[in-house]
Amino acid sequence: MDHYCTVRDMNHGIKPKDGPVLVTGASRGVGSIAAMILASMGYRVTASTGRPEEAAWLYKTVGVEEIINRSELASPGKPLQKERWAAAIDTVGSHTLCNACAGVRYGSIVAACGMAQGMDLMGNVAPFILRGVTLKGIDSVMFAKEKRAAIWQQAVQYLPESRMDSLTTVYPLSDAITVAEKLLSGGIRGRAVIQCS
């Protein structure tokens, strides 16, 4: 649900013609789904990933138009950087989130919904007070159940079940520990679902 909330809240008046949207962690669950929804809505997606071996999958299945290596964003950067993206969805946190804020265009929005790199936010106020950038936190935990149902109904038009299946791998409960280890080491592509029955 947080992937669609992220895309919906990210809109902020940003239109596909305004330029590419950065999605960090794009080869993982939330990132790949957010990227696919954006592409389905007509946005050009720049995917940040540390898994170059997933390039063909990101281009063909997810629908991204550009891939950058996560190392470009993973270290401390300048307070303001070249305006590269019309908006950003960050699933990573830490330096990556700070660099996304520093690299979006004037009046843009960055939606933060993850902390794979870390919970720290060691940035500065320059993007917010000099470019009017909005940082929007996405809460998928306390979000009201009724609103979730409405959002899922809207999301289906951009991400039908057949496309969602192309991003999802289902594992038996007996593989949960192995899958968790692979997930923590970056070895899972897309969305991992553990079947409990």
Question: Could you say what each language-model-derived stretch is?
Answer:
Residues 146-197:
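C-terminal hydrophobic helical "lid"/dimerization subdomain
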Residues 10-18, 68-85, 142-143, 163:
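Short, flexible, glycine-rich and Lys/Arg-enriched loop motifs at helix boundaries
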Residues 39-95:
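Adenosine-nucleotide cofactor-binding segment
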